[in-house]
């Protein structure tokens, strides 16, 4: 791909204060996009936005009012919305027998209801601008069951996968593409903490044909491509970013 693949495009990225979201924001800005960093963590979000020359928006993805206010800010500042990245997500690490209903509801609210509301309010803005791209951060757990995660997380990511495909079919007529990406474990500070046990990390790496964890750059680079015009005919795809894990 040539330089500046997202020049002239405006993107709102949720959960972008740190980790994968921050790297997506950095790469999008690097590729010429006007980036809005959406997050509930003001301090970290403002720091990330300032470091790349982006705009921070305080965004609670579980609140429709917060979504409406965020899009209002985008339109006031940039005048258009070309890309929405639904990256925000949570995982309460309990199996189905341990999971209480309140925790289940919390995961549904962030991982499913959040993207639903974001897409709902992004669609008319994208349509008015002649089209757009919606990218949803799912997981390999949105494609297959996996022993390293829990049933509720898998349920939410599976729902997001099918929401993606349904939106892709219905809104293609408006030149709006919708795709999901499905990383395996990504090496972030949180994951490094979880894998302090070398045996546990070795077991995880043993499942991945490429023999390593994904980096945040691996994920962000895939999203740059999917958001760009080079991916103009890619719609409704569930893209694994997993080093071959789901190829077994």
Residue ranges of predicted features:
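Short C-terminal tail/terminal secondary-structure segment
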Residues: 2, 144, 224, 235-248
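Residue(s) in the substrate-gating loop at a strand-loop-helix junction
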Residues: 139
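Substrate-binding pocket helix/loop in short-chain dehydrogenase/reductase
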Residues: 95-96, 103-108, 204
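Alpha-helical segment proximal to the catalytic Tyr-Lys
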Residues: 124, 169-170, 232
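Short, small/polar-rich loop/turn modules that mediate ligand/substrate recognition or access, typified
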Residues: 172-177, 234-236
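Canonical Rossmann dinucleotide-binding motif of NAD(H)/NADP(H)-dependent dehydrogenases/reductases
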Residues: 5-36
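Active-site helix of classical SDR
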Residues: 119, 156, 164
């Amino acid at each position: 791909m040539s330089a500046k693949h997202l020049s002239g495009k405006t993107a709102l990225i949720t959960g972008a204060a740190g980790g994968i979201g921050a790297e997506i924001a950095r790469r999008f800005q690097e590729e010429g996009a006007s980036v809005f960093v959406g997050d509930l963590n003001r301090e970290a979000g403002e720091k990330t936005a300032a470091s790349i020359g982006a705009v921070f928006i305080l965004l609670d993805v579980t609140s429709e009012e917060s979504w409406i206010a965020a899009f209002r800010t985008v339109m006031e500042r940039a005048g258009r919305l070309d890309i929405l990245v639904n990256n925000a997500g949570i995982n309460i690490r309990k199996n189905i027998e341990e999971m209480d209903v309140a925790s289940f509801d919390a995961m549904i609210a962030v991982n499913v209801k959040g993207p639903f509301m974001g897409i709902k309010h992004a669609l008319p803005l994208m349509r008015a601008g002649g089209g757009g791209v919606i990218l949803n951060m799912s997981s390999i757990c949105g494609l297959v069951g996996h022993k390293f995660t829990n049933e509720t997380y898998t349920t939410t990511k599976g729902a997001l996968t099918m929401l993606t495909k349904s939106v892709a079919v219905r809104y293609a007529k408006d030149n709006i593409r919708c795709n999901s990406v499905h990383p395996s474990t990504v090496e972030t500070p949180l994951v490094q903490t979880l894998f302090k046990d070398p045996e546990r990390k070795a077991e995880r790496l043993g499942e991945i044909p490429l023999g390593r964890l994904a980096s945040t750059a691996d994920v962000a680079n895939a999203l740059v491509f999917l958001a760009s015009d080079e991916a103009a005919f890619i719609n409704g795809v569930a893209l694994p970013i997993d080093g071959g894990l789901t190829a077994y």
